[in-house]
Amino acid sequence: MSNRKTKGNSAVHPECLSQVQRILRERFCHQSPHSNLFGVQVQYKHLIELLKRTAINGESNSVLIVGPRGSGKTMLINHALKELMEIREVSENVLQVHLNGLMQINDKIALTEITRQLNLENVVGDKVFGSFAENLSFLLEALKKGNRANSCPVIFILDEFDLFAHQKNQTLLYNLFDISQSAQTPVAVIGLTCRLDILELLEKRVKSRFSHRQIHLMNSFDFPQYMKIFKEQLSLPEEFPNKVFAERWNENTQSLSEDSTVREVLQKLFNVNKSLRSLHMLLMLALNRVTVSHPFMTSADLMEAQHLCSLDSKASIIHGLSVLEICLIIAMKHLNDIYEEEPFNFQMVYNEFQKFIQRKAHSVYNFEKPVVMKAFEHLQQLELIKPMERTSVNSQREYQLVKLLLDNTQIMNALQKYSNCPTDVRQWATSSLSWL
């Protein structure tokens, strides 16, 4: 089959498209070793120099990488570690320990994970230690090859660093920072957090042992730079096997970046959230629409992707509810309007629902109370309402306080798209306090 095809609906070899999907998906999921860093070159230089001082010179360091979610904190540290490990003398000696505050929720779990990642389970064996500090010191001592100069440097990466600060006594942080200040095994402690006030969470003894180095990532690029990132992220590399297809794909990407509809889509996304994560999500959804019969991305693909990105998941759930459940949500909406967002209980919702039935005199909505209760519990299972306190065994379910997790705009927009919604139910939703 000839590679010289027109841009229309001409057939493209499936293997070629498969390679495109693989390359771009790896890039969008931050799994590609060749992806670029955008707008953080200064921060990257600072971080790599700090890591080299630990790995090559045996100097202990600590630093916090601070920035909002999606700003590239993980990508920054991964790129720095990749470059560091390409140095032969470093790759043979430096050890890495990756911890996450969502997974290592206490000191014992963290210590077990450190032992596992350092491959020291056999060394520890059945030894009993008096304290966390003693155990950690033993692990690092086991890595020594004689003197400090020959010790294996260890790089600790603590993701969700602020969650470690909420652990009891901050024992893990204290001991890691204490070691980084002492003359023991050279270590680098790298914390990743989205909390700008992270230092306020640290105890005085922990703060005194921290170097107070911070690297801030703030997504400071403007829209023209954002458009440049869009083109770079969607372009195929020069080494792509099918040169003709790569050239046409990149020409199509260039024309997309100049399309007014595409620029409008990207401007909206930029105004709401200019993190690369949100851009990658948009491009990933658009890429899913590329097929053998539709081999080039279009503005329509990006518009559909934007629509999917902006979908309200809770409003979408409403479309699948029964009329009874819709009625209960409307009753809760009115209770919110009356009591100004104060919590309510099932009995209050049921009474409001009964007013509607009596006003309309519709026997079609006259369900037994246990049936209404079942519908109310289903809304709770769908997390459209949430209990305000933990349910006790002896408490009556109908008097348990709950809160509606939908606002009026979400409810009204969902009702507009709700198929076969009875007219009187729709009118009830738009009515004011006059129903009382």
Swiss-Prot record:
It comes from the Eukaryota. Keywords: ATP-binding, DNA replication, DNA-binding, Methylation, Nucleotide-binding, Nucleus. It holds the Pfam family AAA. One of its GO terms (cellular component) is nucleus. The modification N6-methyllysine is found at residue 7. Gene3D superfamilies: P-loop containing nucleotide triphosphate hydrolases. Belongs to the ORC4 family. This is Origin recognition complex subunit 4. It comes from Cricetulus griseus. The lineage of its organism: Eukaryota, Metazoa, Chordata, Craniata, Vertebrata.
